[in-house]
């Protein structure tokens, strides 16, 4: 699945 919003993936990686 491709992430349309960069913050989504970023928030997950930040956690």
From Swiss-Prot:
Cofactor: binding comment: Binds 1 Mn(2+) or Fe(2+) ion per subunit.
Catalytic activity: 2 superoxide + 2 H(+) = H2O2 + O2
UniProt EC number: 1.15.1.1
Cofactor entry: Mn(2+); Fe(2+)
Keywords in alphabetical order: Iron, Manganese, Metal-binding, Oxidoreductase
MF (Gene Ontology): manganese ion binding; superoxide dismutase activity
Annotated GO biological process: removal of superoxide radicals
Family: Belongs to the iron/manganese superoxide dismutase family.
Function (record text): Destroys superoxide anion radicals which are normally produced within the cells and which are toxic to biological systems.
Oligomer and partners: Homodimer.
Protein name per UniProt: Superoxide dismutase [Mn/Fe]
Source organism of this protein record: Delftia acidovorans
């Amino acid at each position: 699945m491709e992430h349309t919003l960069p913050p989504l993936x970023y928030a997950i990686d930040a956690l």
